[in-house]
Structure formats: C-alpha cells, structure tokens
Amino acid sequence: MMNGSALQRISDDIPRISNPLGLAAMGIATLGVGAALTRLRPSNREGRSQRFARMIEARLRATLEKQVTRGEYGNVNSAPWDVDRCEVQVNEGFGKPTVVSFTVVMTACGEELAEDLRARAAQGLLAAAVEAAWRNPEIAPIVIEGKLQNDDEDIVDMRALGYSSLQVRPEELFERLGAPAFDSGWKPV
C-alpha cells in the first residue's frame, strides 16, 4: 500500500494541462486526426475472396459463351446453365497451403437439353472454374475445393472431374494444370 507522500510524488510527476485554450486545441486536433484517418482509410476495398469470385464468374460466363458459339449443345442456341453467383472463401493459414473454396450457384436454362449434355456442360464449367482459381495472379500454390449448385443441390463437385477428393492438393492440380500463373517456376516437392 502506498503512503500519502509517495502518491503525491507520482501525481506531481504527471504533466498537467490547465490552460483552457490548450485543452481546446488538443481536443480539436484529436477530432481532426480522427476525421482524417476515417477519410483516408479505404472503406469499400474488396478482399481476396471477392476478387476470386469476380474472376471465376467472368471465366464461367466466357466459357458458356464459347460453348454456345462452338455449337456444343447441338441446335440449342442457349447455354444449359446461367451463373447466378459465385461464393468464394480464401482461407490462409501460417505454414499451411491457402485453401480456395468456392460454390457457384447456377440456374438451369434450355429445358429441351438432354440431361447427359447438361451434366457434361456442368463438368466443363467446373473445370474452367478450377483452372481460373489455379491460374490466379495473386497466390500459389493453393488447395482448391469447388462445386456447382442448383436449387441448393450439388450438381457437380471435384470428384466428378476425376480428382481424388473434394479438396484437391497443389500436387494433383500441378499434374493436370501445370505450374500456377503466380509462380510459373513452382513444382511440387
């Protein structure tokens, strides 16, 4: 427990501002710094997950257009699927490979299309999405887990493309797709 004289010495060492004008100036300066930091901070900056989602969606839309142009669906002049949205989660961990997990929500189009043709188209779209994620310009190597859904029901997942599991490791992706775009010299150990 402190005695009165020790407490008095400590309180004497603490600087005091007793000038009202000085206190007002410090208060205004504090408000100014707070306002400046709020204005300078980017408020609507998107994260890596959003950039990956945009990249995958763009690749899927381009793939659908190419498939229709090449006539891969016979006499049908519309794509079998329409991309509603792409939900991506990029999980980075210390000492572990980054995991890119995505779900593309699709709507079925072109009712006259045969189911086997629609399923094959979905596999092609998932393969395009996996390649887009693997060839990203930001990080490598990555683990990829992806699937396509329609009405909360899985249409196709990584196993339908012949991968060994739902989460595909970088070594297996390298075997099929080569080196990632971010690090073209990368090879599995």
Task: Give the ranges of each region predicted by the language model.
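Short edge beta-strands and adjacent turn/loop segments
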Residues: 51-54, 58-109, 149-151
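Short, flexible active-site loops
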Residues: 41, 109-111
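Juxtamembrane low-complexity tails/linkers enriched in Ser/Thr-Pro and polybasic
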Residues: 3-16
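Transmembrane-cytosolic junction motif
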Residues: 35-55
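Polar/charged, Gly/Pro-rich intrinsically disordered segments
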Residues: 138-189
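Hydrophobic alpha-helical topogenic segments used for membrane insertion/localization
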Residues: 16-41
